[in-house]
Amino acid sequence: MMAAVMNPSRQGSVIGTPKWRIPQWMLMPYLSVLGLVLPVLVYLLMMSHLGWRAPVFGDRAQSNAAAVAEGTVYLFVSETNKQYYDTIGGNYEVLVQPWRKYFKARGREYTEISDLDQVRPRANTVVILPSAIAIGADERRTLAGLQESGVSVLTTWASGTRNSDGEWTGWDFLQSLGIVVLGEREKLQGSERQITMSAETPLTLSQAPGQRVWLSPASEPMLRFRGDYIAARLTDWYRVETPGYPSEGAVVYTESRASRTVGFAFAETSWDASLNLIYPTLDDALLWLQRQPMIALANWPNGYHAAQLVEMDTEHLFGAANALADMLKARGIPGTFFLLTSEAIKDPKTVRRLANDRFDIAYHGDIHIGFAKQSEAEQQNRLTLMRQQLASLDPALARSARGFRAPTEAYEPITERLLQKMGIRYHLVDPSRTEAALPFFLKAKDVSPDDELVVMPRTQRDDLNQLSLTQDPQALLKALTDDMDNNRRDGGLGTLSVHSQNMSPGQPLNQAMAPYLDRLLQYQRSGDLWLASGEQVEQWWRARRNVAVVGSRQGLRLELDISVKGNAPVSGVTVLVMVPARGTVPTIRVTKVGAVQPVVKRVDDYTSQLVFPTLQPGNYAYQVNFSRRTK
């Protein structure tokens, strides 16, 4: 049964059926029992075949539930709302029941109340308003008083848009919570039920950056929110914001005086399609509302928030690769060139130049025909010929080339098995391979973790996509930059793929590329964006997997343990710290002899980084305190 009448200001609805997939990851907690008497939870190895990290926080298992501190979570289910939904032929239980299921699934205690006077304001208290459309004047005053005393609020959808008599009152109530409502979300080519997660915010520590989240069809139209901070953006499938509607959120958070607010722009009836993503977001949101410190291993090294790869599919008009190589070399930007070997053997001079300038040289197949729907034998023959052709130009280069990208992004599971067997270390794939903007490890039978293929999704529109929309160099530059900015905000791996046939002098891409690279360089110099080749991303992703971060909370102090396995040191390890109080900067004390002192960097009011120059294999221990505030 639907809740009915989801447009708070009028009857009816305009919601279509979304396209959605089941995300290709799952959390796997491992419980180790030591001895026959005392079971000890060692720490969580939360790894998916996508290879993205889930934060490890003390004894938190599959959720943040174990990390909840003192304080109470109240679920406000008022008679006023029940009566309002009854009058419009709806059923308020449909919106409340998902919360009860969430608390049961997470093993979290909560108190369901029908009157806000039942709230006992204590430290870390949270009131949840589950699509509470009808809120009376007395209830609004009571809630405002609770906020002044430090109670925080989590609200969903169109709470407070009507009074106790069911009369429309507008968006003023949500605005009083720090949420600006810009209206309803319009249909967007089938993506109106998709939101995109930003990484490394207090509300998304359990999410991969750029994670597409598909919401269930609902009679309640999604709203467009704006707040001080955005944890989930409104985008299309390519993670691009709607033109003319920048910086609009599906999940926002803010803080005003003593109270914090989290707002979800969609109703509870939308959750079912992605409970495995919604629940961790609720976990993190409640932790933030309860002012709990949190930690996580960052995705990228040296404090960078996001990464960017620029690569060329070097095929027809092979020599035009020199134009991109010139631009990259002049700026000191690494790049990857995927060589179509049947074309490469016709232009050995360009191949030698790319190799001599130490660009990442990788394979793009033998001929420009995809590998999909071909027999294993045919694929093997093609891969063998591909390597032989490059070896005819430079045997050492043919052996050292680590990456592969299938022509037309057409490949099959057998293709990747053959790549792994021949020693290829990474595969740059199509954007639909994963819903997240991160590399992942391809699990394969009888393949050791060290030899697993690193799969990297193309996360941005390529030059063919962009040139089909515009031939104007300035418009193209803006589109390329917008895609990069979106990924930079989300914190993922941005992958721009261009083609040699579009890089000749005078072509729009050639004209747009230099200023685009200048923008990339600007962000790298600011410490925000890591510019890396495919090989560098692959090597980092392998090194990062050898690092484990475990935290345990002692009041508002954290005990932090870091372990590095393997035989090689890891440089640039970055640990994210979500501080309990706005503007606090953590102080770090080494508690184990020989531990490396990190550099502490403030990111924003709620986030700091601990950046470790180099960590040798071994174990390290620290104490993290939160007594120092910024001025």
Residue ranges and their predicted role:
Residues V603-K631:
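C-terminal beta-strand-rich structural cap/linker in extracellular carbohydrate-active enzymes
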Residues P23-A123, S270, L328, F337:
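Aromatic-Pro/Gly-enriched surface loop or interdomain linker
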Residues L188-R257:
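Catalytic beta-strand/loop cores that center a nucleophilic Ser/Cys/Thr
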Residues G210-E220, S563-T584:
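Surface-exposed beta-strand/loop patches in extracellular or lumenal glycoproteins
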Residues A307-H316, P457-Q536:
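Catalytic grooves of carbohydrate-active enzymes
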